[in-house]
């Protein structure tokens, strides 16, 4: 088993020695990671770390196309998927029993695993449409909100309502929606995905697009109404941007079924968290997949294996009541 680390030498040696002595008898021989639709950041990022963990731990594993964070919470809660990815908003709704996939079911068997990145909310239109601001979006515009049950589909329609936009709702995978935008079947796509969003990057290659930022007033309204934070999409993210674009964002976390073996989850976390350069090679959004961002989780209980890793390697002060089983 290989564990690449960028931590202190003593931590590396201790971790490597412990890894060799781990009892793997109760580990699964294979696993899946619930991601989202093809063409989105979740699929690229999730498939990447799934393959990495499988390779490093000598298991069979990979990413699975899903409807995104809401469905991932359900899949991981039931154990149909060992791992998944979610944003803090859908996670909170799922714990409260308001996940639309299974209303009334409190999905408490999905535990926090590691921090991923922030998901900015951004709007894209064809340059030929003349839509350059949210206020330019015409009444009755056909807006693609991503896969049903995704973070974008859950929150962006409510955000558009808050900003006074009248629209016709459309759902689909990001790649498919990008094609519909290019073909004139959609007026706007409302993206909530880690940047750069593959579908947006692909659109930039094929046509001229406008990546629309929120005004200060629009951003303030969203910050007041939703569980989001201020975020700027860096101008270097897309060739279209000439300056940073004002946005809002939610944090994403990898999740694990709470009953998975502690040593298995701890080893998987080590593979992902111990080499950020390798993770950035999977997707640029992984620049935020850093151990110190463990504190961005204020919603989900931690898997005991993940909590142990962050306590040992990131000096994480995770309270006992935030660790599953305590």
Predicted feature descriptions by range:
Residues 92-98, 109-115:
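Short beta-strand-centered segments that line the small-molecule binding cleft or hinge
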Residues 28-29, 176, 182-183, 193, ...:
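An extracytoplasmic/periplasmic, membrane-proximal ligand-sensing/linker region
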Residues 1-19:
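Gram-negative bacterial Sec-dependent N-terminal signal peptides
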Residues 20-93:
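N-terminal (or domain-start) structured segment
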Residues 28-56, 60-61, 119-183, 292, ...:
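Bilobed "Venus flytrap"/periplasmic-binding protein-like clamshell domains
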């Amino acid at each position: 088993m290989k564990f690449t680390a960028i931590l202190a030498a003593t931590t590396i040696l201790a971790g490597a020695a412990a890894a060799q002595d781990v009892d793997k008898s109760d580990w699964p021989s294979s696993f899946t990671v619930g991601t989202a639709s093809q063409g989105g950041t979740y699929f690229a990022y999730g498939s990447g770390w799934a393959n990495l963990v499988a390779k490093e731990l000598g298991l069979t594993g990979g990413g699975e196309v899903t409807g995104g964070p809401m469905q991932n919470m359900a899949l991981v809660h039931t154990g149909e998927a060992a791992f998944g990815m979610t944003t803090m908003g859908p996670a909170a709704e799922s714990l409260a029993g308001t996940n639309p996939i299974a209303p009334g079911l409190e999905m408490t068997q999905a535990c926090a695993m590691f921090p991923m990145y922030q998901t900015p909310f951004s709007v894209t239109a064809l340059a030929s449409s003349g839509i350059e601001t949210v206020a330019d979006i015409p009444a009755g515009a056909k807006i693609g909100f991503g896969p049903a049950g995704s973070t974008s589909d859950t929150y962006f329609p409510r955000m558009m309502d808050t900003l006074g936009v009248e629209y016709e709702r459309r759902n689909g995978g990001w790649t498919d929606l990008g094609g519909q935008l290019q073909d004139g079947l959609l007026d706007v796509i409302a993206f909530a995905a880690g940047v750069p969003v593959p579908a947006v990057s692909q659109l930039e290659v094929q046509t001229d697009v406008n990546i629309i930022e929120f005004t200060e007033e629009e951003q303030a309204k969203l910050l007041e109404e939703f569980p989001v934070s201020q975020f700027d999409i860096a101008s270097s993210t897309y060739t279209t941007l000439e300056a940073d674009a004002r946005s809002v964002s939610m944090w994403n976390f990898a999740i694990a079924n709470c009953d998975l073996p502690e040593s298995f989850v701890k080893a998987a976390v080590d593979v992902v968290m111990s080499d950020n350069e390798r993770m950035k090679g999977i997707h640029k959004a992984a620049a935020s997949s850093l151990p110190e961002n463990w504190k961005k989780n204020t919603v989900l209980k931690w898997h005991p294996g993940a909590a142990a890793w962050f306590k040992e390697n990131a000096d994480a002060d995770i309270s006992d009541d935030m660790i599953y089983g305590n």
